[in-house]
């Protein structure tokens, strides 16, 4: 499980920070989750694979748009994403995960030593993008106000397989006051490129979650009296696919430690 956000108070990064400031801080070695940073800009998950396995994953993402909404697919060996001019995909994420044959072998803040000319990067939308619009509408996002990472869970929801890749869906959860659940569904639904509307509202057991207080990734949830658990498809699903499908080599972001793009969130609003 990824560590929580105990160091969030040690940095000046916050809602008013620019994507460039955040990426520079991560490039310099700052490690912390990215929720609550760079208001108004889209955040993204990463999946990096050898070219020989990239088509299968591209097909997997297209068949499973809800958890894997593609914002950009980079050419083999390219490290400068179109979604963030001036960025380096190898250094500008606070924490990466390195996988070999489905096993996690390292968590590092810089992947230059692992980089290869055949690696293809997939930039995948993240629900952190619509958290600021939720808060602007008066819907509380409790893990941000508590200084925690968002809780994420493995589920029983089957993804559609593609080539070598198969998985169940991973979801993120936010406790929403019962009177504001409809607002949360409506607002997040405006952002289909960053997971869109929830996949489940209410009973966690309906999607195979036994105990919401013990997430598989991220931090334990913050739930207030009257809150309803609301679950969104999550871009950690590709990591579940890596563990299930066991590709020879892969690199991902660490859950909650996203790539902050230079794209405005409004560009992904419908």
Curated annotation (Swiss-Prot):
Keywords: Lyase. Its EC number is 4.2.1.-. It holds the Pfam family D-Glu_cyclase. InterPro entries: D-Glu_cyclase, Putative_hydro-lyase, UPF0317. Gene3D superfamilies: PSTPO5379-like (3.40.1640.10), PSTPO5379-like domain (3.30.2040.10). It comes from the Bacteria. GO terms for molecular function: lyase activity. The keyword RNA-binding does not apply. The keyword Nucleotidyltransferase does not apply. HAMAP family: Hydro_lyase. PANTHER family: D-GLUTAMATE CYCLASE, MITOCHONDRIAL. Belongs to the D-glutamate cyclase family. This is Putative hydro-lyase BAD_0077. It comes from Bifidobacterium adolescentis (strain ATCC 15703 / DSM 20083 / NCTC 11814 / E194a). The lineage of its organism: Bacteria, Bacillati, Actinomycetota, Actinomycetes, Bifidobacteriales.
